[in-house]
């Protein structure tokens, strides 16, 4: 009988240690999966001279960000618009303005699990991908 209880105790100890390791790995993975708000320098690095592509309000788009502050957006339906973009270094926000806009539209850029998101106070996070260079079509 003593032999059985020692054997069970040993198995219990192994299972307990294994569960602890699994829990520790789970907690560590959660810590690494936190969203990060990009700085103005990081926003500039990913956008400047590159194209963002994704879906905005259900419409597929490609938007190029030229180093001179010009931005071109082309949607899947063929709609094309040329505007301006810049970065507010104090608030670390991306800003854009298109013909007809009264004010600059501001968005935060977030990174979560190596994916980028546009984030504002009024819209849910919207995922986008970066294409290197000018890739509007």
PLM feature spans:
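Generic short amphipathic/hydrophobic targeting helices enriched at N-termini
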Residues: 9-11, 23, 32
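Lipid interaction determinants
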Residues: 29-84, 91-137
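Bacterial N-terminal signal peptides
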Residues: 20-28
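Intrinsically disordered, low-complexity peptide-like regions
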Residues: 12-15, 30, 86
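Bacterial N-terminal signal peptides that target proteins for export
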Residues: 5-19
